[in-house]
Swiss-Prot record:
Descriptive protein name: Ent-kaurenoic acid oxidase 1
Chain residues that bind heme: C443
One Pfam short name: p450
Role: Catalyzes three successive oxidations of ent-kaurenoic acid giving gibberellin 12 (GA12), a key step in gibberellins (GAs) biosynthesis. GAs, which are involved many processes, including stem elongation, play a central role in plant development.
Residue stretches spanning the membrane: 5-25
Family: Belongs to the cytochrome P450 family.
Localisation per UniProt entry: Endoplasmic reticulum membrane
Organism name: Hordeum vulgare (Barley)
Matches recorded under PROSITE patterns: CYTOCHROME_P450
PANTHER family membership: CYTOCHROME P450 26, ENT-KAURENOIC ACID OXIDASE 2
Top-level lineage group: Eukaryota
Gene Ontology cellular component list: endoplasmic reticulum membrane
Length: 499
């Protein structure tokens, strides 16, 4: 046998050794987490792969999302193990069951006895231990009851609508009048606009400097939300946790100032009541008021939910409308009809006008499905539970893969096509449309978010055009889907503009 042949044999043996070592390490890691279940219960687990110790499936997860093919992660499990609906993995340093079908997601989300919130350590630390993401059922119900009406109630939305409408009109006009070549980062500026709106709603008295500081700090915090909780220089979580400390300090200063003024402005007049004032004053049935750390964590949570999703979905909806002339024309015709129905003397939009936006609502829903801002959420089993015939052991984490549901061709035919008409007819069955979750932990700011998005699209459709500088720009999927150039574009005011 020649020297070349020996080298070939050695290479094959080495490759086989690597494969054997990989299989042995994976098997040992799986045994470590499942041995205590016993043979009977272990045999009822969903199929899957626990990966290597410490990292588990995180490398494959990050590789899929950072390569621009986010669906390939769950697709790899489906190819290897079939369409089981549940898969076993090791994610975010925990043994995890991943739910990927409407039926599995619905059962987990609707069972508050068997499942509690189970977000990763990084998310809990950054949003806050006293926020919804870390609360038990009773405390969550109490806080949701205290905060829901001031966010999504009819009176609340009515009071917010005027400011949202004025802000959108002023912002669009300003963008269309920019100097130079007119290009700017559309997503970045949208996020600033939605942040101004949410700060006004929650902290109406915050000055411009404080609002700008909050926006910069929050942006740093957000990039660590889906990272592993490694608090070392160079890691996203390390930078984010430091931003969290600065954000808490800034909110505490505003809170201290509010308490000191006792509902008065600096000049001594009665101050308008905003969400922070309501959180300071609100009492539950037992007469208990919220502590400062509870108020701050609630504010951070709503800054995240109300600002991040609105900015990104508004950008993508605008892009999809501009890329689909027939859809744009239909949405524009609806908004023109609404304008013609507004009585003389009415200033701005009303909730009555908003509720006439049937087709625009379909556009927003299709954008929510297509983009998947919240691609996954987290629960933890409080006891052994069987879902789809598989065991979810007590203490294990559960990931609810909303993205897999929304991009499943068995649920949505041709899922990679942007098609608002799929929302015509009866509402989707429970578990198939999950942009805001489901059950008692449905996102409390969903109506406010849709109101913001719809008001922006209303004015954009009636008077403006978006032209992207890099229309084929690559998309980055973590922490949220966005073009790598933040949608560098210019806004042009049309001659037929109504504003």
């Amino acid at each position: 046998m020649g020297e070349g042949a020996w080298w070939a044999v050695a290479a094959v043996v080495a490759a086989l050794a690597v494969v054997a070592l990989d299989a042995a390490v994976r098997a040992a890691h799986a045994w470590y987490w499942t041995a205590s279940l016993g043979a009977g219960r272990r045999g009822r687990l969903p199929p899957g792969d626990m990966g290597w110790p410490l990292v588990g499936g995180m490398w494959a997860f990050l590789r899929a999302f950072k390569s621009g093919r986010p669906d390939s992660f769950i697709d790899s499990f489906a190819r290897r193990f079939g369409r089981a609906g549940l898969y076993r993995a090791f994610m975010f340093s925990s043994p995890t069951i991943m739910a990927t079908t409407p039926e599995a997601c619905k059962q987990v989300l609707m069972d508050d006895d068997a499942f509690v919130t189970g977000w990763p350590k990084a998310t809990v630390a950054l949003i806050g231990p006293k926020s919804f993401v870390n609360m038990g059922y009773d405390e969550h119900r109490r806080l949701r009851k205290l905060t829901a009406a001031p966010i999504n109630g009819f009176d609340a939305l009515t009071s917010y609508l005027g400011f949202i409408d004025d802000t959108v009109v002023t912002t669009l006009r300003g963008w269309s009048e920019r100097g130079g070549d007119g290009h700017f980062e559309f997503l970045t500026e949208l996020r600033r606009m939605t942040f101004r709106i949410i700060v006004q709603i929650f902290m109406g008295g915050a000055d411009e400097r404080t609002a700008a500081e909050l926006e910069r700090t929050y942006t740093e915090l957000n990039y660590g939300m889906r990272a592993m909780a490694i608090d070392l220089p160079g890691f996203a979580y390390h930078k984010a946790i430091r931003a969290r400390r600065r954000l808490v300090a800034a909110l505490q200063r505003v809170l201290d100032e509010r308490r000191a003024r006792g509902g008065k402005t600096a000049a001594g007049a009665a101050a308008p009541v905003d969400m922070m004032d309501r959180l300071i004053a609100v009492e539950d049935e037992g007469g208990r008021r919220l502590q400062d750390d509870e108020i701050i964590d609630v504010l951070v949570m709503y800054l995240n939910a109300g600002h991040e999703s609105s900015g990104h979905i508004t950008m993508w909806a605008t892009v999809f409308l501009q890329e689909n002339p027939e859809i744009l024309a239909k949405a524009k015709a609806e908004q023109e009809a609404i304008m013609r129905s507004i009585p003389p003397g009415q200033k701005g939009l009303t909730l009555r006008d908003f509720r006439k936006m049937a087709y625009l609502s379909q556009v927003v829903d299709e954008t929510l499905r297509f983009v998947n801002i919240s691609f996954v959420s987290f629960r933890q089993a409080t006891r052994d539970v069987f879902v789809n015939g598989y065991l979810i052991p007590k203490g294990w984490k559960v990931q609810l893969w909303y993205r897999s549901v929304h991009m499943d061709p068995q649920v949505y035919p041709d899922p990679k096509k942007f098609d608002p008409s799929r929302w015509e007819g009866p509402p989707p069955r429970a578990g198939t449309f999950l942009p805001f979750g489901l059950g008692t932990r449905l996102c409390p700011g969903n109506d406010l978010a849709k109101l913001e998005i719809s008001v922006f699209l209303h004015h954009f459709l009636l008077g403006y055009k978006l032209t992207r500088k890099n229309p084929n720009c690559r998309v980055r999927y973590l922490p949220h889907p966005r073009p790598v150039d933040n949608c560098l574009a210019k806004i042009t005011r049309l001659s037929s503009s109504h504003g």
